[in-house]
Amino acid sequence: MWKMNDVVSVRYERDYIFYVVFDNGLAGEIDFSEYPGRGPVFSPLKDPDYFRKAFIEGGTIAWPNGADIAPERLYEKLLTLTMMWSSKNGQ
């Protein structure tokens, strides 16, 4: 059975980018710039100060208004980026 990995650390980097760490050690920068335009629950994220208020809740990244992003989506996104980087750099 597949184990869902939880976000254990989130740190704001710049613009719409957070450095995210999962419970299995997978870590890296994720660009969240696509989310502020994805409907009313995410529209407050257009405000940079509000965007930086992200916190961890239930193993994923969430914001005070109840917006959150499925941890498996974040994991898949980061894993894909990591695999692309490794392939590009011969690792």
Annotate each language-model stretch with its function.
Residues 1-91:
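Motif-centric detector for short Cys/His coordination patterns
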